[in-house]
Amino acid sequence: MESVFGLVGKDFAIVAADTSAIHSILVHKTNEDKIMILDSHKLMGASDETGDRAQFTEYIQKNVALYQFQNDILLTTAAAANFTRGELATALRKNPYMVNIILAGYDNDTGPSLYFMDYIAALHKVDKAAFGYGSYFALAMMDRHYRWDMTVEEVIELVDKCIMEIRSRLFVAPPNFLIKIIDRDGAREYAWRESIKDDPVPVAS
């Protein structure tokens, strides 16, 4: 029951994702970070198959870092999105990745931006996006309450509404969510919304 969503505010972008690592009927952990920090000013939220998600997002992160190392310049958000789309499209014809992506970034000349990319490499620049079962409710809430000029506080309030709606409407809802923000100061973790915590397993004596 994965849920990943993001939206663009006045001078920032936010990505939120559930933190459950599940397989079939089993929950392996509830603190899995599904939002990769690609570089100082880019975030990539991903959902779907756990192995594909982890491998593909790390592959993109390392290639973005390689480009910066070789050229001494950061990729723009649009360039990173198109590179990611190209890699997904290439893999689609060989060994496809089952991964859906929301890529957010901040560029000094254009400001914040958000890109929606599905597992068949369809790419769109959007103001708001969501994947997973929670997207049915998150998109409805964002359609109703979203404005392009929202402040950070207003967006966080909307994100909390989306999380509460997901928790109340899904039969097996993810308990915890992680929120990350990106603005001119860079990409960083903003907040957790937790209803349960993973306790450390005691060591047998």
Predicted region positions:
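Long, low-complexity N-terminal extensions
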Residues: M1-S205
